[in-house]
Structure formats: structure tokens, C-alpha cells
Amino acid sequence: MDVLTDQDVQKFRDEGYLVLEGLLSPEECDALRRRMSEIIESMDVPEHCRTQFSTDHDEQLKTQGNADYFITSGDKIRFFFEKGVFDDKGEFVVPKEQSLNKIGHALHAYEPLFKRVTHSPKVQNICKKLELINPVILQSMYIFKQPGIGGEVTPHQDATFLYTQPLGRVMGVWVALEDAMQENGCLWFIPGSHNDGITRRMVRTPKGTFPLTDFIGREKDYDDKLFVPAPVKKGGAVLIHGEVVHRSAANTSDASRHVYTFHIMESENTVWSPENWLQATEELPFPSLYT
């Protein structure tokens, strides 16, 4: 049975995003969260990694782009932290399970539970219904959106970071492992904004230069009134077109908002930009979604 109806497909093409209920069962969500707790419990944080992740553009360049740890994380499982979770000596000032912004970017390759969800029959069915011929998996992330400190994610388009020629070949699958409501930082979209192209790209700088990445162009200013909330219940998912403008507010509630998200690219007749921060490696070529 198809996960998407014809009406769903049309809505996704018209608006650039689609909320789906029940992609995962509550038990599957809980299993992913338990496995993530085990990963955190055993994590060994390198000294240089006690640099904090930021969603602010300048901070993002300074901390992520300048750090080899980030730019070489495409084929690894690595840890990125919220602001203010370390003291001056690099020690945790909050419980370590509450310190993380995200873990990325190869859970889909190296963690069996996450791999199973990524390649699930439902996800494959969605891609076939969207007429994807040879979709590959680019990256995956576990995003925590910690209670009280989970930072705002400013308006952006995924194609800024995951650029292809032609455009329109990348889709995010954003799976809520807990209820994602307005109170704890659900996604907001500008419907139809995926038709307007992109105005900014994050690119690798020439070898031997610093920082390791830079931005070309600038993000447009968006009217806040154009954004529509996309709350989703535990186990539901949001399909995200690579050019649709979206954001999420800071999580000021006392409830976390754990999410597993991954990006898919239609590789048929598509050029993946060699300037993107994320590149396939010998250790991990972009794996085919279809099994």
C-alpha cells in the first residue's frame, strides 16, 4: 500500500513540504531514542571538539566551517554541542545527555537501527511514489532541540548547503521521535517558496585557506507572516524539498524535541557540487536508498 496518496504528492509539489503521520511506530521511536542514549553514554569527546555548535550564521562559520572536525564528519558519527554547555576548562556544566545539539552525519551507514529506518519499505515507497529513479542518501542527523536551551534555527534552504545541478534533486525526511509542537520548536515553512531558487551557498574554500568554508550570496529577508507551522506527532515525518524556506524557533519549553532526519538526492542526471562541504568518500560513497 502506498504511503503517499496522489493528493499528497501534489501537495508536496505545490507547497514544498508535506506532513505525514505514522511513518514510525511509537516503539520504533523509543528504540531509536534508547540507542541514542547508549551512544551518548559511551561518547568520548575530543578536546578540540569542545567547540560549540551555533545556528547563527557568523558563529556557524567560525565554529563549524573552521573546524576540520565538522568538514570531515560526512562519513563518521560525531558530536556537536549547544552553546554554553562547557565551562572555561571544557568541562560539562549540564548533564552530557542535555548538552548536544546534534549528532551526524553517518548514522544511516553505521548504526543498524537508524540504517533500517532510513531504508525502510515505507521510505522506499515514498521515493518511488515521488518517481525518484536512483535516490542516494547524503547524510543523516539526530537533532535534540534540548528543553530550555535548544537554539533557534534561522530561515534557510537545505540546497544552500547541499547544492546540485539542476536544483530540485534533494529532499529531507524529518522524523519526529517525540511530539514536535509549536511549544517545543516545530518546523515552520513558507509554502511554495521552493519555486524561487536559492540566493546563498555554503562552499568549500580553496585548499590551504582558512576558514574551510564560506558563504556566497546572502539569505533573503523573509516576512515572518508568511511562515506556517508544521506540528507533527511522535512517529510522524515531514518531507522537505531542498529549496523550501523553513525555520524553527528556540525551544523554551521543558520538553525536548528529538528528531532523526536524513537527506536523499535523486542521483539520476544530477551533478553533486564538488564545492559542497559534504563529499562522498572512499570509505562511504553515497549509498543507494533502494535495497
Curated annotation (Swiss-Prot):
Q: Which residues bind Fe cation?
A: 156, 158, 246
Q: Which domain of life is it from?
A: Eukaryota
- List the InterPro entries: Phytyl_CoA_dOase-like
- Keyword terms of this UniProt record: Dioxygenase, Iron, Metal-binding, Oxidoreductase
- Cysteines engaged in disulfide bonds, as pairs: none
Positions contributing to 2-oxoglutarate binding: 102, 141, 156-158, 174, 248, 257
Kindly list the cofactors needed. Fe cation
The EC number(s) this enzyme carries: 1.14.11.-
Listed GO MF terms: dioxygenase activity; metal ion binding
Which PANTHER family does this UniProt record tie to the protein?
Answer: PHYTANOYL-COA DIOXYGENASE DOMAIN CONTAINING 1, PHYTANOYL-COA DIOXYGENASE DOMAIN-CONTAINING PROTEIN 1
Family, according to the entry, reads as follows: Belongs to the PhyH family. PHYHD1 subfamily.
Job of this protein: 2-oxoglutarate(2OG)-dependent dioxygenase that catalyzes the conversion of 2-oxoglutarate to succinate and CO(2) in an iron-dependent manner. However, does not couple 2OG turnover to the hydroxylation of acyl-coenzyme A derivatives, implying that it is not directly involved in phytanoyl coenzyme-A metabolism. Does not show detectable activity towards fatty acid CoA thioesters.
**UniProt name for this protein:** Phytanoyl-CoA dioxygenase domain-containing protein 1
* Species whose genome carries this gene: Danio rerio (Zebrafish)
Primary gene name: phyhd1
